[in-house]
């Protein structure tokens, strides 16, 4: 039976950050809400916390980083997680290491991947990521399909005046590779909304979604956040598009059923908060670990609440007017 927080939200999945190291330097990366300090969890510690979490009803895991495939023990970690999780195990990756290990990841128990591709244009890709590895990322999409790590999702963070015009080509790439395209809103906490970088690159996805909705031939709904998945036809087939819009979105928070694990061994109750983190690294007693899990769940609270969404338009309008 799942465990519920004070707001009636069940905890059904874990989002496990394996590291903070990455071979990209995307300027908008939130690093799963952590800094680069701290010793990483061992495979044994990860398995222990997954085992305990499963006892409380967790049966789905997302692996993240940093870049999780930079860990030499990634195959072992996936295998240990699979011992206890019969549901979906997925991983978010930039894909640069994936062609070499995709089949081994699948064999170990990984079900599918999200691959980050924030522009199909080499120069814009370089500006965003600081690398020239776009060809390796595209190869990773193909390798993931070949290995059966499907459905592949392509993560595309939409950035004002930078990659918005790349969306039509991204739709083609997704259709060519039978992948789902996730258009993701640039996300930050309340304090970050006033930063020059956020105001320069954040754009509301509502107008883009309205255009896609008009052209869609069908719609499905995502289980996690009850968000729509649009089906569109193009010259390369049918493509599915999801919009991830967490910024000042109380509905997004209301449907959150995920508990996060930081790479340094903490239960993290919310991406946008660190003051409610519950450390567990070094705890080997399973009863104590169960207590810490319960404490973390009791501290879960929606970051965005009803009333916050009104400020979305105010923030957006202010940013637009000041950028003119």
Swiss-Prot record:
SMART domains listed in its UniProt record: Elp3 (SM00729)
A Pfam family recorded for this sequence: Radical_SAM
Residues involved in GTP binding: 15, 62, 92, 153, 258-260
Superkingdom as given in the UniProt entry: Archaea
InterPro entries given in the database record: Aldolase_TIM, Elp3/MiaA/NifB-like_rSAM, MoaA_arc, MoaA_NifB_PqqE_Fe-S-bd_CS, MoaA_twitch, MoCo_biosynth_MoaA/MoaC, rSAM
Positions contributing to S-adenosyl-L-methionine binding: 66, 116
Domain Radical SAM core: 6-234
Pathway the protein takes part in: Cofactor biosynthesis; molybdopterin biosynthesis
Cofactor(s) listed in the protein's UniProt record: [4Fe-4S] cluster
Cofactor note: Binds 2 [4Fe-4S] clusters. Binds 1 [4Fe-4S] cluster coordinated with 3 cysteines and an exchangeable S-adenosyl-L-methionine and 1 [4Fe-4S] cluster coordinated with 3 cysteines and the GTP-derived substrate.
Binding site for [4Fe-4S] cluster 2: 253, 256, 270
EC number assigned by the record: 4.1.99.22
Binding residues for [4Fe-4S] cluster 1: 22, 26, 29
Gene Ontology terms describing biological process: Mo-molybdopterin cofactor biosynthetic process
GO MF assignments: 4 iron, 4 sulfur cluster binding; cyclic pyranopterin monophosphate synthase activity; GTP 3',8'-cyclase activity; GTP binding; metal ion binding; S-adenosyl-L-methionine binding
Reactions it catalyzes: GTP + AH2 + S-adenosyl-L-methionine = (8S)-3',8-cyclo-7,8-dihydroguanosine 5'-triphosphate + 5'-deoxyadenosine + L-methionine + A + H(+)
PROSITE patterns xrefs: MOAA_NIFB_PQQE, RADICAL_SAM
Major enzyme class: lyase
Keywords tagged on the record: 4Fe-4S, GTP-binding, Iron, Iron-sulfur, Lyase, Metal-binding, Molybdenum cofactor biosynthesis, Nucleotide-binding, S-adenosyl-L-methionine
TM helices/strands, residue ranges: none
Function comment: Catalyzes the cyclization of GTP to (8S)-3',8-cyclo-7,8-dihydroguanosine 5'-triphosphate.
HAMAP family in the record: MoaA_A (MF_01225_A)
Family assignment from sequence similarity: Belongs to the radical SAM superfamily. MoaA family.
NCBIfam families: moaA_archaeal, PRK00164.2-1
PANTHER family with a match to the protein in the record: MOLYBDENUM COFACTOR BIOSYNTHESIS PROTEIN 1, MOLYBDOPTERIN COFACTOR SYNTHESIS PROTEIN A
Protein name per its UniProtKB record: Probable GTP 3',8-cyclase
Organism, as annotated: Thermoplasma acidophilum (strain ATCC 25905 / DSM 1728 / JCM 9062 / NBRC 15155 / AMRC-C165)
Phylogenetic lineage: Archaea, Methanobacteriati, Thermoplasmatota, Thermoplasmata, Thermoplasmatales
């Amino acid at each position: 039976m799942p465990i519920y927080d004070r707001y009636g939200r069940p905890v059904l999945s874990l989002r496990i950050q394996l590291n903070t190291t990455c071979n990209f330097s995307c300027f908008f990366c939130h690093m799963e809400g952590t800094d680069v300090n701290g010793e990483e969890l061992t495979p044994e510690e990860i398995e222990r916390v997954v085992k305990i979490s499963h006892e409380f009803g967790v049966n789905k895991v997302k692996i993240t980083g940093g870049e999780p495939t930079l860990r030499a023990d990634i195959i072992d970690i996936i295998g240990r997680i699979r011992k206890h999780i019969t549901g979906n195990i997925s991983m978010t990756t930039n894909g640069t290491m994936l062609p070499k290990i995709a089949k081994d990841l699948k064999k170990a128990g990984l079900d599918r991947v999200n691959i980050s591709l924030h522009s199909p244009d080499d120069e814009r890709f370089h500006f965003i990521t600081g690398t020239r590895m776009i060809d390796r990322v595209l190869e990773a999409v193909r390798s993931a399909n070949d290995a059966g790590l499907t459905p592949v999702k392509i993560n595309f963070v939409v950035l004002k005046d930078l990659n918005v015009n790349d969306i039509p080509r991204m739709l083609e790439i997704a259709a060519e590779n039978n992948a789902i395209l996730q258009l993701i809103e640039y996300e930050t906490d309340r304090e970050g909304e006033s930063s020059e970088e956020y105001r320069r690159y954040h754009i509301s996805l509502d107008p883009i979604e309205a255009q896609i909705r008009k052209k869609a031939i069908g719609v499905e709904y995502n289980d996690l956040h009850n968000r729509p998945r649009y089906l569109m036809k193009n010259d390369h087939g049918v493509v599915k598009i999801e919009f991830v819009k967490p910024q000042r979105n109380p509905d997004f928070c209301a449907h959150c059923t995920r508990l996060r694990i930081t790479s340094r061994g903490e239960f993290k109750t919310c991406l946008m908060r660190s003051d409610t983190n519950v450390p567990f690294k070094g705890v080997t007693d399973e009863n104590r670990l169960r207590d810490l899990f319960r404490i973390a769940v009791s501290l879960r609270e929606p970051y965005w609440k009803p009333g916050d969404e009104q400020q979305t338009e105010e923030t957006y309008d202010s940013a637009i007017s000041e950028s003119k």
